[in-house]
Amino acid sequence: MRTESGCFNYNNGIRIHFRSGGSGPRTLVFLHGFAASHTTWEDIVPFFPADRFRIILMDMKGFGLSAKPRDGAYSIEEQARIVRSFIREERLSQVTLIGHSLGGGVALRACLQAIAEKEPFPVERLVLMDCAAYPQRLPKFFRRLKTPILGPLLIRVIPVKIMVQRTVEKVFYDQSLITAERFERYVRYFRGRGLAYTMRASVRCIRPEEYEHIGEQYRLISLPALIIWGEQDVIVKQKTGRRLHEDLPASRLTIIERCGHNPHEERPAETYAAMEDFLSGLHLESQGNGP
């Protein structure tokens, strides 16, 4: 599917970049994970028929081609407010939010905010991939990023290619899929201006104590939800997906075999197959690998 760039101005001038394509009646809004961008979806987008779906690939604030203001406001709550504002201002309807990792957490928070504020929210379904839904211990590198002195130093001292190598080795289960082209795509992105600040600011906004009782809130979300998880994910373990399946009352869970943290990159065909019937609204009941 061919996509074109667009821009949305949030809160008096914060530029939010997105790419969109397709002319179908159902709108799919994709939300990437931490330190990623709209390019993370390049492997799976071609599977979506342009006559059935309209696709919007958002760059969240501070990531990709979106603005990176040094305002410290990079919490999941803030990102969720931006998503809601985007949906409202663009007058979207029949929306499915598709979130990976951090983006899944943002999708969930957007739903909870709309429920709390009793605001009409034209989201019909959720697709949550290896979702950052609960408090968990951050990887060592991210914990160090939070420190005032060591964090900025790490970003400057560690060569980008080493940082990328360590990242993709943890993200991908099948190391043969880390092609030179994919590796260089990650390197180009990590060298982007302003990303170092965004990464530090985002990590500093993570406060696990605020999410201690989040499971009880998720039970308020009645939307049909498809939870997709890589069987060998070492970033957000499979048990998190099973817990989320228990907490979301209208959810189904599909486990993608021989797959790490990024099913949409590592197993795009299998991931799309898991999504196809769900997005068409044919059924919700659990099938295949899901319980």
Model region roles, listed by residue range:
Residues 20-65:
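Conserved HGGG/HGGXW glycine-rich cap/lid loop of the alpha/beta-hydrolase fold
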Residues 232-236:
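Acidic catalytic loop of the alpha/beta-hydrolase fold
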Residues 157-220:
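Conserved alpha/beta-hydrolase catalytic His-Asp/Glu region
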Residues 11, 57-102, 119, 273:
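Active-site loop/oxyanion-hole signature of alpha/beta-hydrolase fold enzymes
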Residues 251-291:
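Catalytic active-site module of serine/aspartate enzymes centered on a nucleophile-bearing elbow/loop
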Residues 112, 121-156:
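Flexible "cap/lid" loop of the alpha/beta hydrolase fold
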Residues 1-28, 50-53, 81-84, 88, ...:
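Alpha/beta-hydrolase fold catalytic core
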Residues 221, 227-229:
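Short beta-strand/loop motif that positions the catalytic acidic residue
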